[in-house]
């Protein structure tokens, strides 16, 4: 469920919307996070403020704040106007706080759910994005940012080791700092019968100081959709790898919604590398309802033991998994509702439901 309202003050526009999707699922997966006794800790929602002409020269200001039951994210972005043939500059400041379930979560109920491992991450980043002018099919973004990462326990205190005494940071101190140069390229090809999307991200840690993290990481997502009469067949392949210095929180998490359904978040595994494949067949039943059948599979490519502290092995994660299922999607003028039923390789069944955002700030 959700609500949205727009307020106009001159050229400024404020959008307020509430979204229950992620938070209802999270309440079934995570243990109680800190400040549970505070009534405000149960407040969930999003606040978005946009100004299209901040200083009278078409400068754009974007401020968003998202709060869930267990996580929060604050983003401030300022975009300067440029000619169409030049890259658009955006200055971004972001702070997020969330439980680290994907890496340090503990699988329960035959890996169908993940419980809290008592580790949370506070991330602060400051940087600049350069959005290159898009060609007919290609677009790209280059960014450079400073990141400061602090592991916290459920009481909000800084920690440098997990409950088993293994380091949570690469430096061994209560925090990690790094400067990251990132290049993202996107390719899109569409026609009346099919589409193909490809996204490639490459990140490089720059050694500004001797104790800062040096690494190279890449991720890719390729998806292909084909119309088969009234039905749509969608296939998706994603993966990545990281070399160089590494903290456990930088590992690739496998399992959960958007990865391998039928498993809890990160319950399949976490490694230096990963590969996930998804296939889905959807068929409209009427104008507002469609049925869907899907199959997901993923693997850490036997790289779980290469993550510092080997959290996947200590938590008994299998390293590979497959999930099958079906579901319904309901479309209306108020948004989309979806219900998915999945079964994993351990014959454990899971039910996923969601109410995606009714209003977006983008």
Identify the residue ranges that each predicted region occupies.
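Gram-negative/organellar outer-membrane beta-barrel architecture
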Residues: 2-199, 225, 233, 254-261, ...
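Extended beta-strand-rich architecture
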Residues: 44, 179-327
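A short, hydrophobic secondary-structure junction motif
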Residues: 123-130, 206-207, 324-333
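Short glycine/proline-enriched coil/turn segments at helix->beta-strand junctions
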Residues: 135, 287-289, 333-335
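Conserved active-site loop/cleft motifs that coordinate metal ions or position small ligands
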Residues: 291-294, 329, 336-342
């Amino acid at each position: 469920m959700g609500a949205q309202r727009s307020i106009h003050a001159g050229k400024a526009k404020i959008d307020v919307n509430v979204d229950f999707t992620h938070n209802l699922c999270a309440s079934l997966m995570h243990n109680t996070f800190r400040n549970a006794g505070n009534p405000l800790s149960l407040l969930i929602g999003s606040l978005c403020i946009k100004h299209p002409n901040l200083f009278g020269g078409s400068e754009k200001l974007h401020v968003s704040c998202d709060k869930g039951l267990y996580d929060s994210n604050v983003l401030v972005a300022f975009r300067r106007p440029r000619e169409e043939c030049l890259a658009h500059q955006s200055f971004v400041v972001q702070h997020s706080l969330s439980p680290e379930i994907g890496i340090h979560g503990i699988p329960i109920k035959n890996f169908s759910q993940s419980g809290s491992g008592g580790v949370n991450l506070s991330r602060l980043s400051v940087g600049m994005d350069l959005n290159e002018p898009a060609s007919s099919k290609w677009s790209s973004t280059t960014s450079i940012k400073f990141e400061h990462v602090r592991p916290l326990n459920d009481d909000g205190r800084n920690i440098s080791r997990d409950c088993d005494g293994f380091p949570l940071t690469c430096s061994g101190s209560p925090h990690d700092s790094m400067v990251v140069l990132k290049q993202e390229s996107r390719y899109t090809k569409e026609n009346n019968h099919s589409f193909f999307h490809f996204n490639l991200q490459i990140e490089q840690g720059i050694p500004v100081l001797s104790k800062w993290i040096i690494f190279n990481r890449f991720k890719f997502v390729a998806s292909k959709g084909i119309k088969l009469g009234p039905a749509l067949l969608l296939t998706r392949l994603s993966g990545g790898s990281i070399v160089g210095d590494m903290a456990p929180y930088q590992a690739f998490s496998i399992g959960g919604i958007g990865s391998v359904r039928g498993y809890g978040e990160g319950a399949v595994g976490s490694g230096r590398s990963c590969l996930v494949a998804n296939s889905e067949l959807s068929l409209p039943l009427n104008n507002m309802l469609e049925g869907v059948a899907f199959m997901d599979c993923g693997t850490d490519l036997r790289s779980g033991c290469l993550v510092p502290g080997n959290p996947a092995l200590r938590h008994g994660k299998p390293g590979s998994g497959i999930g099958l299922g079906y579901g319904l999607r309901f479309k209306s003028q108020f948004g989309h509702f979806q219900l998915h039923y999945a079964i994993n390789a351990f014959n454990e069944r899971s039910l996923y439901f969601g109410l995606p955002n009714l209003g977006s700030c983008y």
